[in-house]
Amino acid sequence: MTDEQIYAFCDANKDDIRCKCIYPDKSIVRIGIDTRLPYYCWYEPCKRSDALLPASLKKNISRCNVSDCTISLGNVSITDSKLDVNNVCDSKRVATENIAVRYLNQEIRYPIIDIKWLPIGLLALAILILAFF
């Protein structure tokens, strides 16, 4: 298809999954702006083999310097201290490690002086300074 045919088809079918790379949701574009990584480098519809991509977008996608990894958590069990992580990032490394579980320190430390006395204390200090100088 030519670029004109792609745009004509996608203008008429904006909800077609093959056109989502040309017409992404505003939230997808916003994520790309926030992460400073163009959406077409990581957005799944742009990676589809049947995606309708004009030549300029294909050229931009070819410049993406991104390692796209799919990481999924498998069996997560806190009682056995076992964490199974599946990392599909072209690595063949399989690691089995025991993870020690400990509770977070939730000790609450209160200030020595209540904050409501701060303005009164500052006012008293100012009066003392003015009285003696």
From Swiss-Prot:
Q: Which GO terms describe its biological process?
A: fusion of virus membrane with host plasma membrane; symbiont entry into host cell
Tell me the residue ranges located in the Virion surface compartment per UniProt: 1-111
Q: What are the record keywords, sorted? A: Fusion of virus membrane with host cell membrane, Fusion of virus membrane with host membrane, Membrane, Signal-anchor, Transmembrane, Transmembrane helix, Viral envelope protein, Viral penetration into host cytoplasm, Virion, Virus entry into host cell
Record's Pfam families? Pox_G9-A16
**Compartment list:** Virion membrane
Query: Which GO cellular component term is one of those annotated?
Result: virion membrane
The topology of this chain with respect to the membrane is: Single-pass membrane protein
Transmembrane region positions? 112-132
- Keyword Lyase listed? The answer is no
Is the Phosphoprotein keyword given for this protein?
Answer: no
Job description of the protein: Envelope protein part of the entry-fusion complex responsible for the virus membrane fusion with host cell membrane during virus entry. Also plays a role in cell-cell fusion (syncytium formation).
What do we know about how this protein assembles, alone or with others?
Part of a stable entry-fusion complex (EFC) which is at least composed of proteins OPG143, OPG147, OPG155, OPG086, OPG094, OPG107, OPG104, and OPG099. Formation of the viral membrane is necessary for the assembly of the complex.
Q: Which family does it belong to?
A: Belongs to the orthopoxvirus OPG104 family.
Q: Know the name of this protein?
A: Protein OPG104
> Which gene is transcribed and translated to give this protein?
OPG104
